[in-house]
Swiss-Prot record:
Protein residues bound to Mg(2+): 409, 480
Name of the encoding gene: OAS2
Subunit structure of this chain's protein: Homodimer.
Predominant location category: cytoplasm
Regulation of activity: Produced as a latent enzyme which is activated by double stranded RNA (dsRNA) generated during the course of viral infection. The dsRNA activator must be at least 15 nucleotides long, and no modification of the 2'-hydroxyl group is tolerated. ssRNA or dsDNA do not act as activators. Strongly inhibited by copper, iron and zinc ions. Partially inhibited by cobalt and nickel ions.
Family, per entry: Belongs to the 2-5A synthase family.
Binding residues for ATP: 397, 544, 547
Tagged with keyword Nucleotide-binding: yes
Catalytic activity: 3 ATP = 5'-triphosphoadenylyl-(2'->5')-adenylyl-(2'->5')-adenosine + 2 diphosphate
Name of this chain's protein: 2'-5'-oligoadenylate synthase 2
GO terms, molecular function: 2'-5'-oligoadenylate synthetase activity; ATP binding; double-stranded RNA binding; metal ion binding
Region entry OAS domain 1, spans: 11-336
Enzyme Commission code: 2.7.7.84
Chain residue ranges for the region called OAS domain 2: 344-683
Amino acid sequence: MGSRESHLYEKPSEKLEEFIQNHLRPSEDCQKDIDQSVDTICEVLQEPCPSLTVTGVAKGGSYGRRTVLRGNSDGILVVFFGDLEQFQDQEKRQYELLSKIWAQMKHCESTWKLAAKMELQNTNRSSRVTIQLSTKQQSITFNVLPAFNALGLSEKSSLWSYRELKRSLDMVKARPGEFSVCFTELQEKFFSNYPSKLKDLILLVKHWFQKCQEKLINSSLLPPYALELLTVYAWEQGCGAEDFDMAEGVRTVLRLIEKQEQLCVYWTVNYNFGDEIVRNILLSQLQAPRPVILDPTDPTNNVSMDNTCWLQLKHEAQNWLRSLRQNESPGPSWNVLPASLYITPGHLLDKFVKDFLQPNQTFQDQIKKALKIICSFLEENCFRHSTTKIQVIQGGSTVKGTALKTGSDASLVVFANSLKSYTSPKNERYNIIKEIHEQLEACRQEKDFEVKFEISKWKPPWVLSFTLKSKVLNESVDFDVLPAFNALGELKSGSTPSPRTYTELIHLYKPSDVFLEGEFSACFTKLQRNFVRSLPLKLKDLIRLLKHWYCGCEKKLKQKGSLPPKYALELLSIYAWEKGSGAQDFDMAEGFRTVLELVIQYQHLCVFWTVNYSFDDEILRNFLLGQIRRTRPVILDPADPTGDVGGGHRWCWHLLAKEATEWLSSLCFKDKSGCPIQPWNVPKKRVQTPGSCGAGIYSMVNEMHLLRSHRFLD
């Protein structure tokens, strides 16, 4: 595209919406005239006639989906005949039925009073009948197609219709998607459920495609329907809101086009993996060469088959995205993967993590440099004319090595010598945050960074946060700044905290009071970081995979209840690996399945470690015994014994368990030959822990525990 079009897409979202309104969306008057004309034609086609047994007419194409561009567009009128008893009948009798439709329409043509101008065309000896409806600013050409009514009197699809579809395709050796027109009513219904602004985004993408067609060879071979579905997928996976940033939306679609070699898009609203015949159709389609975009109404219809056109569109998308600002990202887009984890075969999970979940190493190096500058600046400049001194340490997934490519979180924990205890006054914490906020602003202005450094607006008493973004990639990390009491003091590498560190905390612990479990976990950030940082790289990739899975669950289930924290799954992943594998290299699918099996069995979980605290101290021992007797699941933070991220009934583990159960049917847990992948053997063995001095032994039967100090195991 030329520079004028590139500048168009650089405009703010509100300008794009204005452009759509003024140039892309059909005028209301034109749309109304064409709608009235179409309704009249449909009524005529359904009038009783000796030669026609019409049971209904469906509206399809761009017209039926309500994605018509101003100017010239397309539509389909699907005429269902009652005497067509199976899919293949429409092919056998196409010539005959089109001839009858043509005769009926010509007979009635002179009596019609249409709001739009109509032109009938019958080409190639009645193998094609078209109706062109025109107004002053709009023209829509409708193909008229006879079809078998696959839905019958129902408004929904049925297993029978898809089984019969497969049988008919095999019988007449028709190409996949040959009979997709029979499901036009479902297609119309599918698009009717989406907000009008999403359809405006579709218009913008189709407009971009039209501009591409003007300069590309064979681009017409790709149906616009493929790009419409890709746009719906981008919105569903990345946004889902009725109101959104139009510029972000179009960037997201173009970035997906860039990744066309990995695209695999499908829906399960009309069909799913439950029936064996349909499942086999789906699996065959989803394992075909990319790109794959399945018609949500017909599982045999891959609408993205033309690879040549996709390569050309990829080139155009890359040119557009890179033409905006040299050496800088063209702007934010939604976080949408080109393929779903659910349909990724087990032997390809390592590649999935590498391609889609691991952060870019160059960006990670830039983050490390930026954090080094920021931490040094804060330590040198905060409270320069005061006795208060601070130490800044990094926490969260970035420093632990478990960050995702997008949406990663991290923390800067600020230890100040003015915070003398866990419960230091809140006004002292406020003063620290206020000073850090001022110095962060100074640091951002004075220092040069290889990344974008954005500080959020801070309003006390809310958390102070900032973001580091790549200037080239669609990657970023969000940081929270947390003032904390330095409970560990100058803890030497490899040593464990003094029991006194925890006994002071335990004395504050009152489950029924305002004290929140794990409220002071920031004080133990260094221990949390060290616990994970030393683990094998592949285990960190398993953690990434579980976090990605969790994010999908969170998006799906957020309206139904509060899910347990991601940290719980991180700890379960470590537990599963330590008890079930322990190898540096392992089968990713086996590890993934093992963790999901643990989630399913959440009502029996009791997981804890003794690397930083143990049963040796009496106060700690009594407290730990109380913790591990609590309602399951129990998953204790290895750095903070008051932090139970299992939480018993506190979170909706049952929702996560239900989702995990459904996922056991996914391709993730099938090997190359289609056989089920088994989980690791994580035993539910009797584990014994010592009671208080000489008081006997407390047994927990059929519970799952982990103690890195194996002296407590049977």
